[in-house]
């Protein structure tokens, strides 16, 4: 067998003792989880923003961003609830490239997954302790869930993972909101089948044991655009796309209809400045159609300190993966959203 064990077995219970939340930070985490659940259920009508860097590659830059975001959250909290993207594991189209903090605690260093697990917990706990913000990460590796679930208030299932049965079944055992992206093909049925699986009880083998889940009624849809066989972007944030998606909730008989629009990726063609225009169009459609306003109640936005991206981490606060909105544009956009709600 070509899989070689490079470390002793990792004890998840011991991992969770590293940078564990206590006191005020734990209370804040619990309050954020409760608020998020109410938003997904429609009991709290604030708009949800899941926003932050494409990848959390530099602890100090990410914390700098987090402190700015937390200050802005205080100013807009009457209409907007912010969850910070703290993405630490990155899917790669062909397996090459920077795979996130969990793989490389130093973005220019060697792969060290054990150090990466510690670095992820250190960063995510610092954000919660220092800012009180709830945080989101992509569940790229379901087997890693036990290492971080006590810190996360939101999980995302990516476009490349949404068809995978293990991702769907593990999501059915998560007790906080879990967003399912449409696959890169754009097939909405694939995404909604995933949400259906996650909202229902499942039985399977996980971490070496037979398990049964409760089902996750907070599983929901994220529209991120698509890419056809010729490499062309196919967007799904226009009026007719939103109507089709919200109709699927009835077709599949799902609980808590809720849709986030991912403003980057194939919706923007990774042209980061397009995120501003996409938000404006969706807000206009919410104003036009009450059904859209009731269901499309959030955005996922890629944002960092500096505009754009770079190949190597030379400029502080600039993405080394997908291009992001810089802070000045982010601040302006969030204030604009607040004013229009």
Predicted features and spans:
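N- or domain-start disorder-to-order transition segments that initiate the globular core
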Residues: 1-41
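Short acidic, Gly/Ser-rich segments with clustered Asp/Glu that frequently serve as metal-coordination loops
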Residues: 54-57, 256, 264-270
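Conserved, mostly hydrophobic/aromatic
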Residues: 52, 261, 326
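Active-site-facing alpha/beta catalytic cores
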Residues: 66, 79-244, 248, 265-270, ...
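Conserved phosphate/anionic-ligand binding catalytic regions in large, soluble enzymes, centered on
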Residues: 48-61, 322
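Internal helix-turn-beta structural module
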Residues: 303-341
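Glycine-rich phosphate/diphosphate-binding loops that line cofactor/substrate pockets in enzymes
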Residues: 37-45, 251-256
